[in-house]
Amino acid sequence: MCDAGTLKEHDTALCGSHCFTCLPQNEFVLIRVIRVLFSALRFNVATQKIIEMFRIEKISSFDSPELQPYATMKRPLEHERQGIFVAEGVKVVRRLLESHFAVASVVLPEKWLETFRPLIEARPEQITVYLAEKKFLEGLVGFSMFQGVLAVGKIPLPISLDDILQKSPPPRLFVAVDALTNAENLGALVRNCVAFGVQALIVGETSSSPFLRRAVRNSMGTIFQLPVIEVGTARCAVRSSQRDDPTHHSLSQTLRDLRAHGLRCIAAHPHTDQRILSQADFSNDCCIVFGSEGDGISVSVLEACDEAVAIPMPPAVDSLNVGAAAAVFLYETSRQRGCA
């Protein structure tokens, strides 16, 4: 009942029996319980709407065939044959969901569901969302994870060289990689490409796929913004069979075709006397070629380039990490084009 000492101006005769202050304690508790139940009902209705827009499954077993892409993450050739890749981490998965890439499924701890719900709801396709504890997911994939957020995306169909040339306004800027097999370095190079406005990445037949999990992770999801041409690989041949565009058989032939279209092909080579970086001209259409840190650019690819250019360094340093070298070359290109 009312506490006259606390509420001196309260008049029970005027307020009526519906005043919370005048209600008996048990009736007040009952009203609070009803409110809690009503809020829970509204939450359940909202959750049901989410489930209708994308499928949610709580998983507790590794046996589901839909989870195989996550269980086989250490077998990348299987993913390449299926034309899929795995995105790992909150930022990378978010960028995948924001991209035009098709998404098959998402796996995450339940605490992340509300974070990703708007992005998943906005997708044109229905996505299956698997919920599980992070420790369970680590057992599924076979390694420790910081956030436990993963997604399976679909590698897009190959893009032809003619398509890229038609869609890229001048001055064109492409990057090609030869024998770059380290996925982390390839991912870092992709990130630099997007940062400096590269219009396409050409991946040679002896390089790793930029859609390997570690490459995608190190690119921080920027691979979803960069058109990729893969030449002369079995994975490219499989995907090319799904469309009529011919696939080039080698990086050296692709570079010759670029030169025929007026692009200057410039090899980033640490041991050349031809020209140093500040003397090279990047102001017009060009393709910059990078090789592996161990073996550099192959002879056949070097011969297909117009010239080789070096970053000047003291004798004690024979080369830079390919990601660092790409950043230096691409910054110089941006500077010459007035974009730096």
Sequence positions of predicted segments:
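Boundary-proximal intrinsically disordered activation/regulatory segments immediately upstream
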Residues: I51-K111
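RNA substrate-binding interface of SAM-dependent RNA methyltransferases
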Residues: E98, V152, L161-R275
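Short, aromatic/basic amphipathic alpha-helical patches
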Residues: E114-Q126, V301
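A glycine-rich helix N-cap at a beta->alpha junction
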Residues: E125-V141
